[in-house]
Amino acid sequence: MVADPPKGDPKGLAAVEPTANGAPAQDPLEDSGAAVGRCCSSRDQVRRCLRANLLVLLTVVAVVAGVALGLAVSGAGGALALGPARLIAFAFPGELLLRLLKMIILPLVVCSLVGGAASLDPSALGRLGAWALLFFLVTTLLASALGVGLALALQPGAAFAAMNASLSSTGAVEQTPSKQVLDSFLDLLRNIFPSNLVSAAFRSYSTSYEEKNFNGTLVKVPVAHEEEGMNILGLVVFAIVFGVALRKLGPEGEPLIRFFNSFNDATMVLVSWIMWYAPVGILFLVASKIVEMDDVGVLFASLGKYILCCLLGHAIHGLLVLPLIYFLFTRKNPYRFLWGILTPLAMAFGTSSSSATLPLMMKCVEERNGVAKHISRFVLPIGATVNMDGAALFQCVAAVFIAQLNRQSLDFVKIITILVTATASSVGAAGIPAGGVLTLAIILEAVSLPVSEISLILAVDWLVDRSCTIINVEGDAFGAGLLQHYVDRTEQRGSEPELTQVKSEVPLGSLPAPNEEGNPLLRHSPGAAGDAGACEKESVM
């Protein structure tokens, strides 16, 4: 029987009524307090998530705002209304970001590779390098095949063939004799072994052609010259070999190894500072590039199917092919890995440069995706130099597009030639804006297509090249993640014989029962076991 409620308590809140199973009922005040506590806890979790991913959100917002601002300024008159001086001032914040990123590329690449190569055993270094190059080669071949298949299926150049004469006449520029395939590979080998390390920091070797008159006949003559741009391939090779040499020195090389490691750590601190300026720079980089275009609508209307083919291929390769390869080998969620590198991907879209994205990519794969420093700082600089999945796919689409444009059929031999040449030439593509277009002429020459049609590709390269850069840096990151998984499995296999030997020496029956009194090392946790949430994970590196 329930007692009468006391005075001042007409609803009987002071009385505790038993429930059906005899347990006392929960106090409503305690319920409200628990609800408030859960609400505060969820707010804290949301706040921690926002704080941890603030740079990602700011970068994505900057990209969207840059597109909106560029379209708004273009609608108000664009570059003609601004004038040359105001256009330069409008693009200045983005130019400043590019200069800051390029400033730290040289010390970051050299120091990270020297330290990474010196920290690895030469045999392990060879295995890691071989696996990395194999992964990059296979993914580039897959990207090339995907590009050719999409271009043959969607026929982007067939509908555009009727408009070819008018657009080619308005957009064509004077063409210099194009580079031969053999000379391109020889230039690649020359750049691997630079004659001067100081000049390799800002120049690279290239072969150009001049037409000279010999007895009334015009002959293409190769001429060697140094072109502006860092010879990053030569610096990468030198840094790796130099790091191996320091390891061979033993104790005598330790001070120099510590110097390069400290230099690299200080450079990463600079990277973390620069990244907070990145959203501002990306906003104006994207906006200024859209403003510089004469008529974005006309370009999309005339070359829309070609753009769609390139972007669709990049989306399939970046969202399906690369994640599927990562999942098949690691059995881990690839899209969680992608979320960890979302900021570098947005940076790649804004800067359109694999090399400029390298510092932030190193920071994110180490801190957010758990890749060891010696792996990321060894694999990522190599990937930024030789892994160009996006460029290979775009070059294959462009080659098939130009063939359809000129009503030239592609037989099986020519398709294989496009695949092989695109895969090989993408290795030599510079990690700079429009680097893939520079090597497209090699593919066109290999299948006897007119190089003059590159002017059409250049008209929309400002958009396609940004998509290429995203795929390039994503492939580098997945390569580092796969190598980290390979190293982890190798270490586990190396420790298994020791564990088996220890277990066989002690019979199971002689072990004490794992209770609290007999084993003081056991401690019961009050909370439930499980992984921490993705937003609560922090780096311990």
Swiss-Prot record:
Belongs to the dicarboxylate/amino acid:cation symporter (DAACS) (TC 2.A.23) family. SLC1A5 subfamily. GO terms for molecular function: antiporter activity; L-aspartate transmembrane transporter activity; L-glutamine transmembrane transporter activity; metal ion binding; symporter activity. InterPro entries: DAACS, Na-dicarboxylate_symporter, Na-dicarboxylate_symporter_CS, Na:dicarbo_symporter_sf. The gene is SLC1A5. The lineage of its organism: Eukaryota, Metazoa, Chordata, Craniata, Vertebrata. Keywords: Acetylation, Amino-acid transport, Antiport, Cell membrane, Glycoprotein, Membrane, Metal-binding, Phosphoprotein, Sodium, Symport, Transmembrane, Transmembrane helix, Transport. It comes from the Eukaryota. Residues 335-365, 415-448 dip into the membrane without crossing it. It is a multi-pass membrane protein. This is Neutral amino acid transporter B(0). Na(+) 1 binds at residues 383, 387, 472, 476. It catalyses: L-glutamine(out) + L-serine(in) + Na(+)(out) = L-glutamine(in) + L-serine(out) + Na(+)(in); L-glutamine(in) + L-serine(out) + Na(+)(out) = L-glutamine(out) + L-serine(in) + Na(+)(in); L-threonine(in) + L-glutamine(out) + Na(+)(out) = L-threonine(out) + L-glutamine(in) + Na(+)(in); L-threonine(out) + L-glutamine(in) + Na(+)(out) = L-threonine(in) + L-glutamine(out) + Na(+)(in).
